[in-house]
């Protein structure tokens, strides 16, 4: 399955140890998402539509209320790059 450039960028950051933080409203609906790199910087390019697409493809998952991380399926989809760890 091919993934688009924006998805590839986010998955690459997550493969290096990044995470996705979410904000919810009082009805527990997701209102905002932010991709945080392993260094603690906020990366651009992630919106709610892209977040839902990655979640639907099972590339990211959250366990126990923790931030979203890349899954094994996401690691298989991300193309290797020289600085991936």
Identify the function of each model-found stretch.
Residues 66-71:
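Minor-groove-contacting beta-hairpin "wing" of winged helix-turn-helix DNA-binding domains
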Residues 75-85:
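Short, amphipathic alpha-helical interaction segments positioned at domain boundaries
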Residues 1-48:
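Short amphipathic alpha-helical interface segments
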Residues 55-65:
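A short, conserved structural fragment
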Residues 34, 50-51, 59-60:
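Short hydrophobic/aromatic segments of transmembrane alpha-helices and their interfaces
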Residues 43-44, 52, 56:
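Short, charge-rich amphipathic interface segments used for partner binding and complex assembly
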């Amino acid at each position: 399955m091919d993934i688009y450039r924006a998805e590839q960028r986010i998955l690459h950051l997550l493969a290096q140890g990044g995470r996705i933080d979410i904000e919810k409203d009082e009805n527990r609906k997701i209102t905002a998402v932010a991709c945080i790199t392993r260094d603690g910087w906020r990366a651009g390019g992630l919106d709610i539509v892209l977040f839902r697409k990655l979640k639907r493809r099972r590339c990211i998952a959250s366990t126990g209320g923790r931030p979203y991380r890349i899954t094994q399926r996401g690691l298989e989809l991300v193309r290797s790059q020289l600085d991936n760890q």
